[in-house]
């Protein structure tokens, strides 16, 4: 209730609607958010990256990988309806997975949460072929719970989700580095260090990436910033010394 008192009332984002084709509810939902983020993406392109014909759908790992290929971080939302509302209030549509069937006979469905009305306890979603579909809080929460509260906020490197915390954000950013998208990883690490300048982890991530790229000047500068926040961390001092040594030998 405290969170709800801080929210705008009511709220509805102008998210482009893309009606799903065939079994493309996931690609259509992702394409809607990509368009909202000013990216030119269509459901066919996203389906080519994520759709599994044998499953007649897109599984969550493929959906996240497709988002990263578009340059969007799929930040994992906490299992919190309040955080979901908070993201929408901050201007972030949320990609959600619902189970519209039963636990023993699931009917998986992706949708985009884009608005709410607290007074009537109504949520608004782009869902399948239905734009701005109205659903009660209770009904949504039931279908969301049966999908284990799966939700992702898709953001570019210029935005940080309203409910983001440093370590989950950096883990999500690291997925870009692990898949070879180093320029994007660098951009998200930079955003983390700007958004949480007193947290050493963002500076450490930037330092390690710069070190791996052979940029010892940047690596030593970022290690130094990390040490300012965590001066008692021996491993940081070691890494800083290695970077300084490599820089002097270059």
Placement of each model-derived feature along the sequence:
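Structural marker of alpha-solenoid helical repeat scaffolds
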Residues: 195, 229-230
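Noncatalytic regulatory segments and standalone regulatory/sensor domains
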Residues: 1, 118-204
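Cysteine-nucleophile protease catalytic domains, especially the papain-like/related folds used
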Residues: 2-80, 84, 90, 159, ...
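Active-site-adjacent substructure of cysteine-protease-like catalytic cores
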Residues: 73, 77-126
């Amino acid at each position: 209730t405290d969170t709800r008192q801080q929210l705008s009332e009511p709220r509805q984002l102008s998210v482009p609607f893309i009606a799903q084709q065939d079994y493309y509810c996931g690609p259509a939902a992702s394409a809607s958010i990509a368009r909202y983020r000013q990216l030119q993406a269509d459901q066919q392109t996203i389906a080519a990256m994520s759709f599994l014909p044998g499953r007649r759908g897109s599984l969550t790992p493929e959906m996240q990988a497709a988002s990263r290929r578009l340059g969007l971080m799929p930040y994992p939302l906490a299992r919190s309806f309040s955080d979901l509302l908070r993201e929408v209030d901050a201007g972030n549509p949320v990609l959600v997975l619902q189970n519209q069937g039963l636990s023993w006979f699931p009917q998986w469905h992706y949708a985009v949460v884009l608005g709410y009305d607290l007074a009537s306890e109504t949520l608004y979603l782009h869902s399948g072929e239905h734009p701005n579909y109205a659903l009660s809080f209770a009904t949504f929460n039931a279908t969301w719970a049966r999908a284990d509260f799966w939700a992702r906020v898709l953001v570019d490197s210029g935005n940080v989700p309203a409910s983001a915390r440093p370590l989950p954000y950096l883990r999500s950013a690291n997925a870009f580095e692990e898949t070879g998208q180093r320029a994007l990883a660098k951009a998200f690490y930079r955003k983390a260090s700007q958004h949480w300048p007193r947290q050493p982890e963002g500076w450490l991530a930037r330092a390690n990436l710069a070190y791996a790229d052979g940029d010892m000047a940047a690596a030593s500068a970022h290690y130094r910033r990390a040490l300012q926040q965590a001066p008692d961390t021996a491993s940081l001092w070691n890494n800083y010394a290695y970077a300084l040594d490599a820089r002097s030998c270059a």
